C-alpha cells in the first residue's frame, strides 16, 4: 500500500496554519508504505523519501507495473521549487523493490493549471492516464500514450462524455475493468456532503 502522509486533521490548524498553500509547500515530504505477502498481515508503516527538498509535497500516489522494463512506475502529484511551488504536476519514479527509487521525472503537466490525482492503466498496448485538472471549472481529463512515461495526448472524446454528467467538483478518478471488457470509472464527488438520510433502504 502506498499513501500520502498528510495528517491533515491534526496539522491543519497548527502545523499548516489553516493554509492549503502551506500544505502544498510542506505537506507530505515522503510516501507511506506498508507491505504484505498475504493481504492479511502487514508490516509497520515506513516512509520513503522519494523526492528531494525541491518537492513541496508528494500527494495521491499510485503504481503500475511496466512489463517492458520489468519494474514499477510510482506516480504522484507534487508542487515543486522549479515554479515556486505553484501549479502541481504529475511526477514518476521507477522501483523494483519499493526501497530504492529512481530520480523523479515529469509524467504530465499543464503549466497554467494544477494537475493532480493521476490514475494510469494499460489496455491493448496503449497507456491511459486520468488526471484532475484545476481549470475553472475543474475537470477530469483522460490522456493516451504509446509509452508508459509519455508523452501523453488529451482524448477530446472523453471531454464530451464528461459534459453529459452533472457539473461539479470531481477528483480521484479510479477505473476498473469489468468481466465483459468494459471499463467502469469511479469519481470522488466532493461538491456536496457525502451522507444521505433515509427512513428505509
Where are these regions (language model features)?
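Carbohydrate-active catalytic/glycan-binding domains of CAZyme proteins
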Residues: 1-201
Amino acid at each position: 500500500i502506498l499513501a500520502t502522509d498528510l495528517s491533515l486533521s491534526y496539522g491543519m490548524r497548527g502545523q499548516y496554519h489553516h493554509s492549503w498553500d502551506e500544505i502544498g509547500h510542506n505537506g507530505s515530504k515522503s510516501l507511506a508504505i506498508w507491505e504484505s505477502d498475504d493481504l492479511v498481515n502487514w508490516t509497520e508503516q515506513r516512509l520513503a523519501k522519494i523526492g528531494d527538498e525541491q518537492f513541496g509535497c508528494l500527494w495521491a500516489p499510485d503504481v503500475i507495473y511496466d512489463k517492458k522494463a520489468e519494474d514499477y512506475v510510482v506516480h504522484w502529484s507534487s508542487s515543486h521549487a522549479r515554479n515556486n511551488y505553484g501549479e502541481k504536476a504529475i511526477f514518476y519514479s521507477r522501483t523494483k523493490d519499493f526501497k530504492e527509487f529512481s530520480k523523479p521525472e515529469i509524467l504530465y503537466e499543464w503549466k497554467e493549471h494544477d494537475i493532480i490525482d493521476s490514475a494510469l492503466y494499460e489496455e491493448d498496448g496503449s497507456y491511459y492516464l486520468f488526471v484532475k485538472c484545476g481549470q475553472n471549472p475543474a475537470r477530469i481529463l483522460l490522456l493516451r500514450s504509446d509509452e508508459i512515461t509519455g508523452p501523453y495526448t488529451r482524448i477530446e472524446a472523453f471531454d464530451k462524455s464528461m459534459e453529459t454528467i452533472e457539473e461539479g467538483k470531481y477528483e480521484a478518478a479510479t477505473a476498473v475493468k469489468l468481466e465483459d471488457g468494459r471499463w467502469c470509472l469511479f469519481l470522488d464527488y466532493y461538491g456536496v456532503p457525502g451522507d444521505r438520510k433515509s427512513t428505509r433502504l
